[in-house]
Amino acid sequence: MSSNSSLLVAVQLCYANVNGSCVKIPFSPGSRVILYIVFGFGAVLAVFGNLLVMISILHFKQLHSPTNFLVASLACADFLVGVTVMPFSMVRTVESCWYFGRSFCTFHTCCDVAFCYSSLFHLCFISIDRYIAVTDPLVYPTKFTVSVSGICISVSWILPLMYSGAVFYTGVYDDGLEELSDALNCIGGCQTVVNQNWVLTDFLSFFIPTFIMIILYGNIFLVARRQAKKIENTGSKTESSSESYKARVARRERKAAKTLGVTVVAFMISWLPYSIDSLIDAFMGFITPACIYEICCWCAYYNSAMNPLIYALFYPWFRKAIKVIVTGQVLKNSSATMNLFSEHI
């Protein structure tokens, strides 16, 4: 009898004095501090890192190109993940409770899905852009213009927002799972149970663009390899100014494709565990332990913080732009026309 009483006392609730409250599964104080530091660092990096990317591309006129506008829009999606998703998911993960209300739970879930797909669509369009740039660099400026980039950006935002809003604000995502959804619907929880049809739709929506990107980047690197061999074979010969220009353009586009290819690979690695886990869960009766699910979620969230690090590692112009912004030189009238590129490509 005494052991049962102590067990009841040990149970903690998200809202101690509210009927129907979710059970709270607390971490130790030390673990909570570590988790808040790890997750908080990711959120801060996602917000300020992507903010630097957006400011750099929008402020410096030298960076105003169709590709970079897509990159800035991608950074905006990752920035919004850092603002609207990661801080609240951090509290939910560490405290094992949702303290922000049911309405905001729906909004949070909607943002989570919408910005994920927005990132995926942006990366898919960037892959197409890079494919054209590398395979036909001299014709590329006439094919992928600023207006085409604007259309791609619009599609990358409108479709995910419409899809996410339609699925989560109409409640169709849990059709056929009403009993399970009601059982999990306690006060202080924000668990979204998605049925097999929508999980399969989500998985295909992730897999098909990912497959397209793999094909495109595979072709990009095959073409880049052929171009590099061609340049190497003709390197000892005297080049005309026209051939020299073609070589410089091709080299620049290959370098950009390589960097953005790393971004695509990082996205795939980050989101693949979550996508596979969601698919398995829906068809195997939601068997994934909570800790595994949270790890998959945070691997995906951390992708929003990775892109600025990739740009800083591979793009000298981004490092220079950061220095100009952080030191306050960006406030000078002449900063917008500053040269961020080295003379040699």
Swiss-Prot record:
Residues 54-68, 129-147, 224-259, 303-345 are cytoplasmic. In addition to the well known disulfide bond common to G-protein coupled receptor 1 family, trace amine-associated receptors (TAARs) contain an unique disulfide bond (Cys-22-Cys-186) connecting the N-terminus to the extracellular Loop 2 (ECL2), which is required for agonist-induced receptor activation. One of its GO terms (cellular component) is plasma membrane. Its main location: membrane. It is a multi-pass membrane protein. The gene is TAAR6. It is found in: Cell membrane. The keyword Nucleotide-binding does not apply. Disulfide bonds join C22-C186, C105-C190. GO terms for biological process: adenylate cyclase-activating G protein-coupled receptor signaling pathway; G protein-coupled receptor signaling pathway; sensory perception of smell. One of its GO terms (molecular function) is G protein-coupled receptor activity. It comes from Homo sapiens (Human). Gene3D superfamilies: Rhodopsin 7-helix transmembrane proteins. Keywords: Cell membrane, Disulfide bond, G-protein coupled receptor, Glycoprotein, Membrane, Receptor, Transducer, Transmembrane, Transmembrane helix. This is Trace amine-associated receptor 6. It comes from the Eukaryota. Expressed at low abundance in various brain tissues, as well as in fetal liver, but not in the cerebellum or placenta. In the brain, comparable levels of expression in basal ganglia, frontal cortex, substantia nigra, amygdala and hippocampus, highest expression in hippocampus and lowest expression in basal ganglia. Glycans are attached at N4, N19. Pfam families: 7tm_1. Belongs to the G-protein coupled receptor 1 family. Olfactory receptor specific for trace amines, such as beta-phenylethylamine (beta-PEA). Trace amine compounds are enriched in animal body fluids and act on trace amine-associated receptors (TAARs) to elicit both intraspecific and interspecific innate behaviors. Beta-PEA-binding causes a conformation change that triggers signaling via G(s)-class of G alpha proteins (GNAL or GNAS). InterPro entries: GPCR_Rhodpsn, GPCR_Rhodpsn_7TM, TAAR, TAAR_fam.
